[in-house]
Structure formats: C-alpha cells, structure tokens
Amino acid sequence: MTQNFRLENVGLINRNKKLSFKFNGKVYYGYEGDTLASALIANGVHLIGRSFKYHRPRGFFGAGVDEPYAIVQLFRNGETEPNIKATEQELFEGLEAKSVNCWPSVNFDIGAINNFLKIFLPAGFYYKTFMWPKSFWYRIYEPFIRKAAGLGVASIEHDKERYEHKYEYCDLLIVGSGPSGLASAYSAAKNGARVILAEDKSRFGGTLLTSDVNIGNEKGKEWADRIISELKEMPNVTVKNRSQVFGYYDHNMLVMSERISDHLPKTKKFHPKQRLWYMRAKEVLISSGSIERPLVFGNNDTPGVMLSSAAKEYLKVYGVLVGKKPLIFTNNDSGYETAIEFKKNGIDPIILDTRKNPQSEIIDEAKNLGINIKLSYVVIAAQGYKKVKSADIAKISDDKEQLGTIENIKCDCICVSGFWTPTIHLASQSGNKTKFSEDIDAFVPGKSKQNEKTLGAANGVYTLDETLKSSFETGYEISKQITKNDNKVSFPNVVEKKSAVHDKFWCVPLPKGKNYKRFLDFQNDVAVSDIEIALREGYRSIEHVKRYTTLGMATDQGKTSNLNGLQLVSKIENKVVPAVGHTTFRPPYTPVSIGAIVGREVGKHSKPTRKSPMHSWHEKHNAVFVDAGVWLRPRYYKRGDENLFEGSKREAKNVRTNVGVCDVTTLGKIDIKGPDAAELLNRVYTNAWLKLPIGKARYGVMLREDGIVMDDGTTTRISENHYHMTTTTAQAANVLSHLEYYLQLVWPNLNVNVVSTTEQWAGAAIAGPKSRDLLQKLFPKSDVSNEGLPFMGYIEGDLFGVKARIFRISFSGELAYEVNVESDNGNFMWEKIMEVGEEFKIQPYGTEALSTLRIEMGHVAGSELDGRTIPYDNSLEGLLSKKKDFIGKRSLSREAFTAEDRQKVVGVVPLDKKTSIPEGSHLVKDSNAPLPNPKLGYISASCWSVEYDNPFSLAILKDGKKMIGQKLFVMSPLKNKVIPVEIVSSHYVDPKGERVRS
C-alpha cells in the first residue's frame, strides 16, 4: 500500500519502523513517530468523524491540543477509550480506532439529516422546542435527546490499567519546551536552580521543529536538541515530555498529567499508563506558546480546511502533505511560511491575503519563489462535502464590507491563518487578571497574582530574538534570587526575517443571496448566525452567550473559537473587546482521564475491613451485610424469601412491640481521661459539661470552626476524671483527629489524654417495651428500674460473670439500653442476650430497621448532618450554650445562619398514605409552576413507618417551623414522581419522649 501524501526524506519520523493500524475496520500503515492524524492524512484519509449537532463531515483542523473535532474511539489491549484526539494520539503497532457520532458509518451517517433541518435547530432550540406537551418529556423528548447526546462511548468494563500520583517540589517549573521554555530552563539550571520542564508533546522544541531560523550557528531544531540533551544530563533538572500541565491552583500548586504508556501497544508490567503530578514551585514560568486563529467563511468546517500552522507541522515533522493543490488564506505572514514550505517540496500553493499591500522579507521570498499571491482577496466559501474540491473567492474592499466578483478556483485544501492567540489559560487560572492587547488583537496576561511569569508567544511576543533574550534573562534572574548564585550564560544571536503587520480582519461577510454556515465552534456546530440569535434574544453577558449557544463548551474548550466569538459579539454590540470580556478559564486545560485523577484509589482500600466480634453469629443467622465506613454491619436478617423492605419492616415492628437487639460495636468510642477532661468537652461541645454527675450521660453536638455540625453523640462520665465518648460510625476517626489537633496545637496546656477504644468494646443495643424485663434477667444483681437506672444513666453490672457497662440511651424512640463488654466477650454477650430474650420474642435488627426507628423518632443522623447544616437546621438550637464559648460559636452569628427563614428538619407524609417518597427529592409549592421551579427543600431520609403503617420522611425545608401543617409537593425527576404531601413534626412517634423515659 502506497502513501500518496507522504514525502520522502522529509520529517522527523522513524521510517525504519513501519506500524500497521486500523481505522474504521480498514488496515493502514504509518511509522514510528506518527500521530494517528498524520498517518491517516498520509494514507489519504481526510474524513474522520461527524459534528455534534448537524452531523456534518469533519476532518483535521489542527495538529495537537488545538484540534477541535478529530476525535475517535480508541481500542487498545482489549480496552476502549472515548473522545481521543487523533492529533495527539501517537501511533503504535496494532492501534485500532473508529469514528464517533455517526451511524451506520462515517461515510453514510443517518444523523446528517439534521443538516437539512438546521433552520429548525438554531442556538437555544432545545429551550424552546421540547416544552409542549409536558407529558412528552419523559416518554419521548428526554430518551431521544439522551440517545442523540455524547460522542464516544465510555467503557463499562473495569479499567485494568494502573495509574499513579506523584508529588514534587522545585525552584522553577517551566511549562512548555519551545524557544522561551528551553532558554529559561537552560539559564536557570546553569545557575543551580532545581528545574522541572514539562512538554505536552512527545518532541521537545515547540515551533523550532518547524522553523528554518538559525540560533547562533545552529538550526533551530539542532539548538533545541542540544539544549535538551544538556538539560537531561543535569542532576538538578527534571525533563518531562508527554506531560500536560492542566491546572494552576493556590500557593503555586500545579497539576500535570503525564502520559507514560499511551503511545505503546501495551503497558509494561508494573508500569502505570498515566501519572498525575502535584507540583509545588517557588516560581512558575509559563511558556505555553500560542494557538493559530482561524478565519471565518462559508463552509469553513469542510474536511480539508485546516490551520496553516498545522499544515506546516504535518509537512515538516511528519513528512505529510495535507493536499496537493493548497490554497493559503491568511491575514498575516504566517500563511506565507506555510506556502514557502509547500513550494520547497514541489507543491504550488496559491495565497489569498486580506491585506492590500503588505511588505516584508517573508513575502519577498514567496514572490521570488514564484508563488501566486492574490492581495485583498478572501475565501467566500469552501466547496465540497466530504473533502474540499474548490473555493469561491473574491476581492474585498478596503473597508472589508464589499465583495467583488466571485471566482471559483480548484483546490484540495484550504490552510487558514488569522494570526495568533496567546495560550493564557494557566496564567488566568493562577488569578492573573488578563488584559487585551490592541497590537495582537488578543488577551495577554496582566499583573501576576502568584509567583508566575509568562514568556514568549504566550505573552504576545512573536519575535524569536526578543523571546530568547527575555527568557534567558528571566531564568537567570529567578535562579539568582533562589540560589544566590551568579552564573550567567550568554544567549546566541538570532537573525530572523521581519514580518508585516497583520490585518485585523477575521470574518468574511456573506455575499447577497447566500446563506452559508460560517462556523466558530467546529465541534458543537456554533455558527455566526447562532451568536447573532443569542444577542438578538437579549443575551449580553459573554458567559450567557457561551451557555446559550454552547460556544467553547466542546471537548476542546474553545481553543480556536473563543476569541473569534468575542470579536463577533464586540462587532455586533459595537463594543470594544475588553468591554465584552472573556469567559472563565477553568482547569483542566485539556481532558484528563478519570483513571489518572483517581490514581491508585481503586477497589477496596488497604485498610482492613472491620468486623464486630459477633460477625460469625450474624453470618450464621442469614445477615445481609452492608458497608458502613470501614465496617461490615448487618443490614437485615433474612428469613425465607424476604426482601430488604419486608425484613427490615418485620424487625422494626418487633422493636416497637417486643424487644430487639442491634450490634452497635461500630460506633466510635473514645476514652477521655485527665483533670481537664471536662474542660475539653466543654470547649468542643456546644452545651455545658462542667457539672455532669458521675454515672450520667449527656447528648452533645460538635461543630466545625465554620459553625457546621461535625458530629453528634453521647458522652458518659465514668468517674471523676474519666469520660466515655461515643461518635457516629462514619465520623469516629475524624472526631479523634479533631480532639487530638486541638489538644496538641491549640490547647496544649490542657492536662487530658484521648484514645480510641472502638475496638476494645463490643456493644449491643437492646430496645423495645420489653427491654427492661430482658435487662433485669441479664443482670439480676443490678437495679435497672427507672429509679436505679434512669434515662441517660450509667451503671456497671455482671453479665453471667463478665463485667459490663450499661448505658440507658435510646436511638429508636423506645425504652432502650446499650450494653458494652470487652471485645473478647462480645459473642458471649450476644448469645446470652438472644438466649434469655427468647421468652420476650427478641429478634436481632440491622441498620435498615435502625434507620426506620430513628426516622420515626426524628433523630438526626448522617443524611441530615451532611456537612451543610447548622444546629438550628436540625432542631438542636437548645443545645447551644449562651454562657460559654465553644468551637464554631462565632460562625453561628453569620447573616445566613441567623436568617428568619432558615431551613429546618421537618416530617413529610404523603397525602394518600401510600406512595413512598424517594430520598433526595425536592419539595416545591406548586408542581405545575414554570421552570425553574423554586426548591423549598429536599428529602433527607425516608422509611415506611411501622407505627402508623404509611410512608414517612424527614426533610430539610426552608422556614420549616412555619411550614408544619401545610401541603406541598415532592418532585423526583429521576423517579418521575410528583407526590402531594403534608408537612408534619419531625417527631412522628412519641413526640413527648415518654417511651424513652418510661
């Protein structure tokens, strides 16, 4: 098989290593060093996919991260990965890829019918089209939209690859290995600084790889190769290719994704596929270069239309011609450089220059080579469907408003250059306030907020001599400040050709009678007409225009479209671009795989799964287990063919009528000892603790410093200076860390020790109206009467020869006790409870029944204490002391926390007393109100009340106290439910608490 578009003896690929690959089921070949894009172009493949909305044919537009639409589904080593840019994916033996967003094939796509319906699918059509009839949404509209959405297909298989995280520190982090990156890295490293140099591509050098400029006595590429070789030999330098720095965060922390094995057929054993680097740098130099800007004209999305710089890169780096009859459409001298490279390799290009009479050495060189140059000319429209076949061109007036006679010229590619846009993403993410440069018609970094500087083309500097000079100097000055060394390297002379001023023109007007689509965002099919519609419909903020039209919201995040979009809004609104502003640059700069973000945190953690001493008993009695943090707890005890609902309902009902026992070993337990133990409790809890009697327990709430509830639980005074604290299962470790932090760093003067005793004690909660009768038989020598062991009381007893702690505490709303014994005796305790309790019809109950009981009682738990609520929200304001200080007290006085209509925990009952209420559902006043329907609250927990035999829920409701008795609606879009409900007290069962005190 021949490659008709591959040049001999041109490029940087390894022609000694031929690689075979498949695209859309057909076998092709390329070479080591190719990307999938360059190999496909070499084989004459230009149609790679379909656009998102209109399913128009799509080819290649860029040559790297700037690529807006050449994305594929990749298959490697038996696994698949969606939305991979063909311009970034390096070729390897056996690579398989296929087109996305097309059916049944890329050549014949049924979805292309959308292109003929485009008059009905303008910007924002989805906000207007699917509004009526309302009943069609769930049955017709939503399924249709979901099926049409998306590009590639995510794998449903377990990812077998390995990913890693690494943490690194350096004096100087340099992003980009172009001229400015190499110069600053070399200068700083020679002066002793610890340097990390990160390059996104596989090859170092940036634009020097495609430039013929000399640096000193060396070609640009030769100079870059020598500098990189020297840097790699330096012990104070880390050089990374295939590494994208995608996020800049506070305190000079940057995150980088390193692609270690993506270019290999198979990841080496014990090697990661990708590695995420978290880097702290004293100084950061951003040398990320610029992205060439497109020119906007009719059908500018046709395969064969691409950036001029991309065409040059394919030619000089990969030895690939993007066409044999190229048309160069430019408003600056960069297009001439590409045309010259075509001419030197035997291809005759035609240049259309929007400028009237530009003068420069580069233009003179093009003229001397005999290149056909048409000044004051523009491309009206590309002609062709699956590939450019010709172009309609015309002369344009000096004011860029009037077009001359339209001509048609044959061509097989159109290489466009609308000047350059600095890559300012990282600078903006750092907090840098960007500014607009009238000289280059683009935004550049402003004043630094963190320790960062931007150099070279990323800062709007496009002369190599000035770039190298400032970069060498900056690297030296920064390293001198850090290392105190003074080893300054000299920088070489650069002789380069001067360029003419670019033309501030980027969008070709439509000829009369023509309605060509002129695209800005190529992946999402956002055209000039879409921006015009958005502005006509009243959207003025550029952020609103972005979201209404989806401009810049595709997988490329608008790298080639955003600035042209801003220019269009500026022109239509008659505002200067700075007044229009720009959208927010958010990380990541390029897509990052979920695997890399997760790293090694997959599957079960290395932490052992904890099991209570009674676990074997639970297993023997058909317990169905559930993960509760690091513990395995019985969810319910299955009888026969019972399901979860039936089993948990039976268990909860038995607690309400007889007696039940629950394994509560998993609750956090902390021993607090010392003369200042009470003082510690008094500071971390919101209520008073200094006068708690020995043998008494008290319920307490802990807050974070911001006033949000951290945890709740009971603490019992065992003796004079000894307290036993219990926490929720989920927060046990956090509470211990919380106490240790304050004792070590904030109150080191307190004489008190804390230690976790969770695993030292086995616990059983005995609850139900017959629980005292059972307890009396278990502890015949102890007084467990209401007088001998009152509510929130504590005694010690003898359980058939085993010492036990007995707490009268209830989480169920029933008369209840908790019995603790040493863990080694846990199973003995449990078996004795079951044996003695048989006459009282005892049944074990799991976490599901426990949840039902606590919801009926109105006791808040993790779903209410979710890190977003304060004591008032949970009806715990009575525990807030007005006399003493405690952690988080000041924060409770914040305006939002003292609002009169603050949210509150309430009860919710369906009016029909039958329909179960899904957790997470929203509460609204009017289910038929127009969207967005104001949300009044949400359902935090739901159960089937065994007391009243109907559904009951807890909710966090705005102004909940005043809403009791009112009728609202619960709406669950996920379950497609609208449920009329009544708001009631959260204390659904025994609101006066008579049972727990009986």
Feature names for model-found ranges:
Residues 198, 290, 539, 649-665, ...:
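Residues forming anionic-ligand binding surfaces in small-molecule and nucleic-acid pockets
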